[in-house]
């Protein structure tokens, strides 16, 4: 019996409608900051952009405030593919590629403009490239401002740091920096820092304006010292296991979303940093603005020593030489 063209067409359409649709990819994004921190705003923005640019083919579920783990755990979770994305400090990546701890060196960048200029160079890209062989892809650099001390006693000179226990990230460079300044660097998980300050496990810590305000560290410390001793980038990292599952079109969309997040975060950070400095002035006993020269002098030898240990002497020389242009 001969089928009519209409019947054939109807049959074909019915058959095609039964073909399984390609499953949506769902990936988790793990952040460590509270919901009202600029990092959290930018993470939410990234998720929205990925959904938009992939037309819903990829859904990013965003978790904040260490819900899925702290920064150290997030690095490993990205590597093994348990989570797809995270925002981590470059310092946190030293556990995978030790050279990334170069970013923790004190007074490495002359100012914000110098910092962002370097991140756009081939030298910065070369520093990050080995991470891919370790299961991590960098999609963008995220602003995290300059780092300053918040303590129980006023820090006006390096001498004031002698004997002080200062919380740092799990970074050998940061521990050695505190030693050069006369203090003891004590690695403490971010989620545990408030209690550590409250109970005297540490005498102080260091971080940027928005992070100090978001976690209300002014409730458990009295003085904030604007020494700007470090400027360490946060990074948007992605699991290479997830990356390798994507089509070329999807890879481009996710990479574009990462660059959009980088730009968005710079704007959000500027707004938050200005606002939060006023909050710090209102809540700390005193905002100390020290002469930076003694701090720079105290750590000058450390920069070269750590550069040699990390195998990044040429990169450090490149950065230090470029300071004159800023």
Model-assigned labels for residue ranges:
Residues 22-114, 122-326:
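N-terminal secretory/targeting leader peptides
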Residues 6-17:
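Bacterial N-terminal signal peptides
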Residues 1-5:
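Positively charged n-region of N-terminal signal peptides that target proteins for export
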């Amino acid at each position: 019996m001969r089928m009519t063209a209409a019947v054939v067409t109807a049959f074909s359409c019915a058959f095609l409608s039964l073909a399984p649709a390609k499953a949506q990819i769902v990936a988790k994004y793990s952040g460590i900051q509270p919901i009202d921190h600029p990092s959290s705003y930018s993470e939410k923005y990234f998720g929205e952009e990925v959904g938009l640019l992939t037309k819903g083919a990829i859904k990013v579920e965003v978790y904040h405030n260490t819900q899925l783990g702290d920064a150290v755990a997030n690095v490993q979770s990205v590597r093994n593919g348990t989570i797809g994305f995270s925002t981590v400090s470059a310092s946190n990546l030293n556990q995978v590629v030790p050279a990334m701890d170069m970013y923790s060196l004190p007074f490495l960048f002359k100012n914000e403009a110098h910092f962002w200029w370097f991140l756009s160079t081939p030298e910065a890209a070369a520093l990050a490239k080995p991470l891919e062989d370790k299961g991590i892809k960098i999609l963008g650099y995220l602003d995290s401002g300059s780092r300053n001390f918040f303590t129980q006693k006023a820090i006006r000179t390096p001498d004031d740091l002698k004997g002080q226990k200062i919380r740092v990230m799990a970074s050998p460079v940061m521990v050695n920096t505190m030693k050069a300044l006369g203090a003891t660097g004590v690695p403490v998980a971010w989620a545990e820092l408030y209690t550590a300050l409250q109970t005297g496990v540490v005498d102080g810590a260091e971080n940027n304006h928005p992070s100090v305000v978001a976690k209300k560290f002014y409730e458990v410390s009295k003085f904030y010292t604007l020494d700007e001793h470090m400027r360490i980038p946060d990074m948007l990292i992605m699991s290479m296991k997830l990356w390798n599952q994507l089509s070329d079109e999807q890879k481009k969309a996710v990479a574009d979303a990462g660059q959009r997040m980088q730009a968005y975060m710079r704007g959000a950070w500027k707004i938050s940093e200005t606002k939060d400095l006023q909050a710090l002035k209102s809540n700390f006993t005193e905002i100390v603005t020290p002469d930076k020269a003694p701090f720079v002098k105290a750590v000058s030898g450390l920069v070269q020593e750590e550069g040699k240990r990390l195998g990044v002497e040429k990169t450090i020389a490149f950065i230090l030489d470029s300071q004159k242009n800023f």
